[in-house]
Amino acid sequence: MEGPGATCYIQVCYRFPSASHPDFFPLSVLDSLLAGPSNLNMFSGGISNKTSRLYRALVDKEYVVSVHGGAQATIDPFMYTITMTVHPRRKPEEALAALDKEIQRVKEQKVTKEEITRAIKQARALFAYGSENITNQGFWLGYAEMFANYNWFETYLEKLSAVTAKDIQQVANEYLKPQSRVVGTYVPQEGKS
């Protein structure tokens, strides 16, 4: 897509299972590892962090100026999205190639125990922060009933902590396939309004 402006954006969408699917938890850890943990409800985004793989591979190397990932807990299968703001000195194809290279790396090389521990810790912290008061706990219990049941909320941290490197590699290969994604690119046309 082309239009007025000076900034190029890319959004990549992969299919993502429902929150009650067993693959949801390894994919949530993979999201935390790649882009920083997501706030799993539809009303909030995730956080970007400088320790994530995509930040180091794309922002630090100046392919993009920002990268965010996002997954939502839903009753039906939905999407996992990665949104990038392309660096002004780069072409969108370069940013997408760098993203693909990093995704291929997680598919082929086992994630280290340290990375998994950090990713789970970050996802746990975001979940704890999002459910620290009684209002948010009530929201999560009700929201969990919509897509699974209240037990999902009560066992979320336990299931997250059980994710292994093998689980992450398996879901990366299953869900992050180039042929199973949609890529949208906004290419600015400076001088047009």
Give the ranges of each region predicted by the language model.
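An aromatic/glycine/proline-enriched structural segment found at the starts
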Residues: 1-20, 130, 185-193
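Short, flexible turn/loop "capping" segments at secondary-structure junctions
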Residues: 3-5, 72-79, 149-151
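Extracytoplasmic
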Residues: 5-9, 53, 62-64, 77-79, ...
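A structural supersecondary motif
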Residues: 11-13, 35-86
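Buried hydrophobic packing residues in well-ordered domains
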Residues: 12, 28-30, 58, 82, ...
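Second-shell loop/turn segments in exported
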Residues: 13-20, 41-44, 81-90, 103-110, ...
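M16/insulysin-pitrilysin zinc metalloprotease superfamily fold
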Residues: 37, 48, 72-130
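C-terminal regions of mature proteins
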Residues: 83-85, 106, 114-193
